[in-house]
Amino acid sequence: APTGAYICGREDLVELCSYVWTAPGLGAEMGSYAASYRPFFEGLFLAPHITRQAMMSAEFCAAVFKVLGFDVVPEPGHLRTDLITAITLGSEENMCSFAEAVQNWSPVDSDAVPVPGPMPGYTDPIIMAAGTFVQGSTIEMSADGPVRPPYIMYFQGGLVFEHTMLAVMGAAEKILAARGGLED
């Protein structure tokens, strides 16, 4: 475990182990986590703010794409129970444009080009965009969805609201450009 361990046995051997696991002379007096609890407490401190940033990002995404005429769930102003916004984009081209914009605006692997591909457990190709610091992170900005009618993209996360705003606007711009602009 990254935050400690249990040692049992003869008392003198347990004490010897404690010096090997921490530092000579410190032994069990050092505590269970030599690397410190700072990252743990930092996470507890930042979690409410980052969660709020992601919730604001989801709400912004829903509002932008609702104004552009796309079906979104949940709709802006409605109760949210998670960070995900489902956007019915209506075409594979729109899904790919959305994913490309999210990837382009990502802090990691922004030069990668998302393309639909097979994934175990799915019968349809999946497109994913996630230039995240932590692979598989759900609080960081990402988008994915099965490439099949009605072409729903699932957008989630965002560590920094202003950054996610740029990505959402980039996705809207890409989709609008492909269809020739904003419709009345």
Where do the language-model regions lie?
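Conserved C-terminal alpha-helix-loop-beta "cap" of PLP-dependent enzymes
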Residues: K66-E183
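Active-site C-terminal subdomain of aminotransferase-like
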Residues: A1-N94, K174-D184
